[in-house]
Amino acid sequence: LTSDHFDDPADLARLPAVSRAMRDLVAETGLRFEELDENRAVILGCLSAVQRLQRGGLLSRQESLCEAAARSGQLEELQVLRADGCPWDAWTCAEAALGGHLEVLQWARANECPWDAWTCAYAARGGNLEVLQWARTNGCPWDAGTCKLAAHGGHLEMLQWARANGCPWDESTCEEAAREGHLDVLQWACTNGCPWDAGTCMLAAHGGHLDVLQWARANGCPWDKTTLSVARAMDHFEMVNWAMANGCPEQ
């Protein structure tokens, strides 16, 4: 085990949760690591880390146990947690949807786990169309967050399906496509009547996506002083020069 094995610090952070021996191996790499906090452990689906926090009396929400199990698709562990009386809430379904774990979501719903619009939004964020389709077929609500997070992830097919099936959208769809540099998503959204505002240009500037900004402006997207101020703050000098040369407001 060497430090060369860990490009992502999150991978290193997972290992101490495995065993005492693994903690010692991590220490031998000479790398420093931070213990996973509750939110990060859930995001990573690291149930063992959440359980360790629980044993140490450091868990702020007992529901985090079910969320972590759902996020990583650990159905048997989720079943054990529920049999032991562990509470859950709508975030369990949302985390299962984000991870693309349809079987976990189906079991949770069959056992009366609540859900809300975040289940659809998280399925969209994860690019899990089958999960989104099942959720909608079974009555899960959705809102503009589904289109927003589909755009954020660059999941054009997901966005197209959502719109074809009546999902609402708003300016946040264009904003998230611009933020992440998904020009094809922005183009499709704009062509199909999605509203936009100066936030689209500002977030293109934030991400340093000059091609997105140029296309947005060529197609009538408004901008204001935030485009320049954000581009400067992020040190996107080519974008600053282009925006100034093309009349972006500074006041």
Please annotate each region the language model reported.
Residues 1-251:
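Ankyrin repeat (ANK) tandem alpha-helical domains that serve as protein-protein interaction scaffolds
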